[in-house]
Amino acid sequence: MEFKVIEGGICAAKGFKANGVYCGIKRPANDTPNAKHKNDICIFVSDVVCNTAAVYTQNKVKGAPILVTKANLEKSGNKAIAVIANSKNANTCNADGVEKAEMMCEMLANELNVPKEQVVVASTGVIGQVLPIEPIKAGIPDLVKGLCYNKNLEAATAIMTTDTVKKEYALEFEINGTKCH
């Protein structure tokens, strides 16, 4: 089988929309009202419920998003329709992490009108800090409103921490004469 690298990231696959915005999870110390900020939260949404698979850390210390995602996939029979992810804060090793991860899933589910068990959550960033939920709550309506089949770069930018390259990749291949992405 031959694979071809293509543009589009998550949006290269038919039926997947994405968006990323800045909501203010961690404001810079020298923040000004007109400052340009890097996106810090994103969503990926499928047109239909998808079968899912997940690989989890074997580490004894697991972040709240991992625990919530695992529980949601168990409840949904490994089905998901959306992912919500943030940067700047790993939501790991803090007292209310699970509650905040569950809230992220529930808020997005309510905005999309889907079961919360079909939403999975991811966080990347600093470990051990409390995740501020209010900026996320305020940002979710804009995320959903701006969902589009070509906003993969906005979403990829939102999950960058100290990375210099966006975390996205898309392939094209053929199965029985049908092109797949």
Regions from the PLM with identified roles:
Residues A82-N94, V120-I127:
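Short glycine-rich or small-residue beta-strand-to-loop segments that form or flank ligand, phosphate
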Residues N51-E74, M160-N176:
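Glycine-rich oxoanion-binding loops at beta->alpha junctions
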Residues Y56, T92-E102:
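Active-site pocket-shaping loop/turn-to-helix segments
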Residues D40-I43, P65, I81-A85, E117-V120, ...:
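Structural motif
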Residues V61-E74, V98-L112:
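Short, well-ordered amphipathic alpha-helical segments that serve as non-catalytic structural scaffolds
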Residues M1-V61:
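N-terminal amphipathic/basic leader segments beginning at the initiator methionine
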Residues K75-K79:
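Interfacial helix-loop-helix linkers and transmembrane-helix boundary segments
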Residues E99-M103, M107-H181:
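Glycine-rich, mobile lid/loop segments that gate access to catalytic sites or pores
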